[in-house]
């Protein structure tokens, strides 16, 4: 039997020294912008009951969730995302809170991934949730918060793509498609797989109104600037679809009005987690990171599954993705702290400690060495790029 004592599971990693410092730095930047914007920080247990995530229209299939059994035979789960536990907290512990609620978090989440696919099983997410307000301005505020968060971390070359969950729903609402057919159609549009899309629409063309069929064919192509909304409006008379387009336009214009339009684009073919999201949806991409570095949207039906019917919108940022992108693009501001090694003889520990403490109070990293020989201490200081102070 193999002994795995010296190894860690696939999809996890040890975070050491400078990398750990960078991660804390990014987390603190994000936390500061949230708190300064009136958000209150929450943390949920790493272990939840599996039932918390086994809900209608979950964003994660059950095979992506790590499960274990407690001493009473109940199924537990490692926290698979943060939004669902926050919905549980709101629905059970914050019923009498003053709304709207502005909550923020930074926590690790855990997801099962296929072996050797390069994805992490342990992910650090940081994000916000605005709960109890169903207004397009709240959607815009959350997107602005996402843009400001990425900018404050030092990212420059990124885009936030905006879409709407109702667009796809409106176009397929009258089609007699079963769940599997609808899911294949959704996936082909979201991944912009035109071959699969044309095949699905051809096989089911008798189930769609002609106008809806034409829009669905064009949906993956409808991405770009705000002009895409006008183009899409000319393709459909569906009232739900037109309302969705107006929502996207309003959000875009609000964000643009405060000078952040350069970070926006429209993607009406964005149709991920379509049963979970209920309104504006968005994803952020940046150079140096393969996946989406930020994702979010409006989810007005989730909290009701935990006892309180509250509308909500929010986003999650991939903290490790930010670090990777900053490193790839050479944008990471990693100032070297001044470091001093304090060497003393055995009779002078008190003086050495007081001198080191004085340096620390000035923001200087001060380490007391316990080497007997001064030569060894100097070599140690040189190897760690530290100044040498002899007491």
UniProtKB/Swiss-Prot annotation:
<comment type="pathway">
    <text>Amino-acid biosynthesis; L-histidine biosynthesis; L-histidine from 5-phospho-alpha-D-ribose 1-diphosphate: step 1/9.</text>
</comment>
<dbReference type="GO" id="GO:0140096">
    <property type="term" value="F:catalytic activity, acting on a protein"/>
</dbReference>
<dbReference type="GO" id="GO:0006427">
    <property type="term" value="P:histidyl-tRNA aminoacylation"/>
</dbReference>
<dbReference type="GO" id="GO:0005737">
    <property type="term" value="C:cytoplasm"/>
</dbReference>
<keyword id="KW-0963">Cytoplasm</keyword>
<comment type="subunit">
    <text>Heteromultimer composed of HisG and HisZ subunits.</text>
</comment>
<comment type="similarity">
    <text>Belongs to the class-II aminoacyl-tRNA synthetase family. HisZ subfamily.</text>
</comment>
<dbReference type="InterPro" id="IPR045864">
    <property type="entry name" value="aa-tRNA-synth_II/BPL/LPL"/>
</dbReference>
<keyword id="KW-0028">Amino-acid biosynthesis</keyword>
<dbReference type="GO" id="GO:0004821">
    <property type="term" value="F:histidine-tRNA ligase activity"/>
</dbReference>
<protein>
    <recommendedName>
        <fullName>ATP phosphoribosyltransferase regulatory subunit</fullName>
    </recommendedName>
</protein>
<dbReference type="InterPro" id="IPR041715">
    <property type="entry name" value="HisRS-like_core"/>
</dbReference>
<keyword id="KW-0368">Histidine biosynthesis</keyword>
<comment type="function">
    <text>Required for the first step of histidine biosynthesis. May allow the feedback regulation of ATP phosphoribosyltransferase activity by histidine.</text>
</comment>
<dbReference type="GO" id="GO:0000105">
    <property type="term" value="P:L-histidine biosynthetic process"/>
</dbReference>
<dbReference type="Pfam" id="PF13393">
    <property type="entry name" value="tRNA-synt_His"/>
</dbReference>
<dbReference type="InterPro" id="IPR004517">
    <property type="entry name" value="HisZ"/>
</dbReference>
<dbReference type="GO" id="GO:0016740">
    <property type="term" value="F:transferase activity"/>
</dbReference>
<dbReference type="InterPro" id="IPR004516">
    <property type="entry name" value="HisRS/HisZ"/>
</dbReference>
């Amino acid at each position: 039997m193999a002994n795995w004592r010296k190894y860690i599971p696939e999809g996890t990693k040890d975070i050491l020294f400078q990398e750990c410092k960078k991660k804390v730095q990014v987390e603190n930047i994000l936390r500061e912008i949230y708190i300064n914007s009136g958000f209150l920080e929450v943390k949920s247990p790493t272990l939840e009951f599996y039932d918390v995530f086994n809900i209608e229209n979950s964003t994660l299939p059950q095979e992506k969730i790590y499960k274990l059994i407690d001493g009473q035979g109940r199924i537990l789960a490692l926290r698979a995302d943060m939004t669902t536990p926050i919905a549980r907290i709101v629905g059970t512990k914050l019923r009498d809170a003053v709304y709207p609620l502005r909550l923020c978090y930074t926590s690790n989440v855990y997801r099962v991934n296929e072996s050797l696919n390069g994805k992490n099983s342990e992910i650090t997410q940081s994000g916000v949730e605005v709960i109890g307000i169903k207004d397009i301005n709240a959607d815009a505020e959350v997107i602005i918060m996402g843009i400001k968060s990425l900018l404050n971390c030092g990212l420059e070359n990124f885009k936030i793509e905006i879409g709407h969950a109702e667009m796809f729903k409106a176009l397929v609402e009258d089609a007699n498609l079963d769940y599997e057919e609808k899911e294949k159609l959704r996936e082909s549009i979201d991944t912009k797989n035109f071959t699969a899309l044309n095949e699905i629409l051809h096989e089911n063309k008798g189930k769609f109104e002609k106008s809806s069929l034409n829009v669905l064919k064009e949906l993956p192509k409808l991405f770009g600037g705000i002009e895409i909304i006008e183009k899409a409006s000319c393709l459909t008379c569906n009232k739900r679809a037109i309302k969705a387009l107006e929502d996207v336009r309003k959000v875009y214009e609000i964000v643009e009005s405060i000078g952040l339009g350069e970070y926006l684009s429209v993607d009406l073919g964005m149709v991920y987690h379509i049963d979970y999201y209920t309104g504006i949806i968005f994803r952020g991409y940046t150079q140096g990171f393969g996946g989406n570095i930020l994702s979010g949207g409006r989810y007005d039906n989730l909290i009701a599954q935990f006892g309180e019917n509250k509308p909500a919108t929010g986003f999650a940022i991939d903290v490790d993705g930010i670090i990777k992108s900053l490193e790839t693009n050479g944008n990471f501001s990693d100032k070297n702290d001044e470091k001093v090694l304090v060497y003393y003889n055995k009779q002078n520990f008190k003086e050495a400690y007081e001198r080191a403490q004085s340096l620390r109070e000035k923001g200087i990293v001060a380490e007391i060495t316990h080497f007997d020989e001064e030569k060894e201490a100097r070599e140690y200081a040189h190897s760690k790029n530290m100044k040498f102070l002899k007491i």
